């Protein structure tokens, strides 16, 4: 719907012209124009993302770049998404934690897109945006040393209580 911004250089130029503090994108976009623009605007390389070709779609994030590649193209920060609560989240947590440690060793900042994905989180309301559940995801993000966390604003609370049943205990509550 916006073919002009399928061009990597146009994405970076828009960020510069718009007065953005940085531009976050993939290895392909940033790598295509890093020599020309990495000194003009900070680059944040998002090293994992979904592939959305598998059917049915699944909530998994796959590495498409390394931390070394991010550093080599002039990025000052790296970012990743973890889908907390998904069947693949344990693997994602370990992989991203290791990548963040490598980034910090190279002096780079880290950003975590911190989202919940689990069909059990939809009951009478959508608890993917519950303050208690997203708060736990944020806590895990800080634990793996994310410098910045991007999270959806809470729209409700009580996700643990709503999902927890006697037959299927879930999480930890004080009730």
Question: What are the language-model segments listed below?
Answer:
Residues 2-175:
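Alpha/beta enzyme core
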């Amino acid at each position: 719907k916006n073919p002009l911004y399928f061009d990597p250089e146009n994405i970076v130029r828009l960020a510069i012209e718009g007065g953005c503090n940085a531009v976050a994108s993939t290895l392909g976009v940033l790598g295509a124009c890093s020599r020309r623009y990495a000194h003009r605007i900070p680059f944040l390389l998002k090293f994992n993302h979904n592939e959305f070709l598998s059917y049915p779609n699944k909530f998994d994030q796959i590495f498409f770049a390394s931390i070394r590649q991010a550093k080599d193209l002039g990025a000052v920060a790296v970012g990743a998404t973890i889908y907390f609560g998904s069947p693949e989240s344990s693997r994602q947590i370990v992989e991203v934690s290791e990548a963040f440690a490598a980034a910090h060793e190279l002096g780079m900042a880290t950003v975590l897109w911190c989202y919940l994905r689990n069909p059990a989180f939809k009951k009478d309301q959508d608890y993917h945006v519950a303050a208690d559940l997203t708060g736990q995801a944020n806590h895990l993000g800080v634990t793996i040393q994310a410098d910045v966390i991007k999270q959806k604003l809470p729209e409700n609370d009580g996700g643990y209580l709503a999902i927890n049943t006697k037959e299927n205990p879930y999480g930890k509550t004080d009730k």
